[in-house]
Amino acid sequence: MQQVKLGFIGYGEIGSTLGAELRGAGLAEVASFDNGAFDGPYAALIQGRAGAAGVALLRSPAELAERCDILVGVTPGSASVSSAEAIAPHLTARHLFIDIASATPKVKQAVAAALAGSGALVADGSIVGTPKDGLALPILASGPAAEAVRDALVPWGMKIDPVGPELGTASAIKILRSVLIKGIEALLDEMLLGARRYGLDDAVLASASKTLARPFPELAAGLLTTGVIHAKRRAEEAGMAAEALADVGIEPMMTRATEARLQWVEALALKEHFGGRVPDSWQDALAAIEARMPPAGGGGQ
């Protein structure tokens, strides 16, 4: 395997996990710059993690750029652009740069704009796993540097999957996926808090598990195609669920939002459009919704 000089901008949970495991895999040169590494409440933690892994902590973006050829941004997404602006004056055509923070495509495009005059080849990355995956943490990558970053780091055990040449594609996949994944987390909280108040948490979880046991594409298709026909009934049931939660002192934030969304679908009169027949595909269902939905800010529920 070819040695590379790798630098992390940020050394929190993701950066420290990858840094330690890459060093363990035999990568000789791993360094990091983190604003909190030498001053702040987490300085001791950052220094301890880096010291244990043999990762060099540097004191400036300039030092990191001088020492490393591949730079990985692992700051919070809110700091992606400012971090790119700080290191941009120190990058050259020898550098590859990938930002793997969770952020919108617009933010990742702003990162690329901040680095545009540097000569560095830039990629947008998004993490679709968790730190417990370790070095095999799944990362989607897009943009001009995506394949080069993959070729340099996959031999060391990283899991990087290029998904296209356009900056922002990887982050769009991740952030839109989060609509569902983060929603599931919030819905589980609400469902099981209510079930706990009724003394039925195990039974409700088991019942939901059976419903969700089908392959996910099949489940999604079934819900979307039947949803355009049965939105009214499902909205009413969501309203009942919200009342049941409120009756035991659980605020039904997610359930009321679900009720409102289903009422919104019902108002599009899709049952009439399809003549009461379930559409052939989820794509047909979504196309019908999109064709009838009011413009953003134009009213509707």
For the regions a protein language model found, what residue spans apply to each?
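NAD(P)-dependent dehydrogenase/reductase Rossmann-like domain
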Residues: 265-301
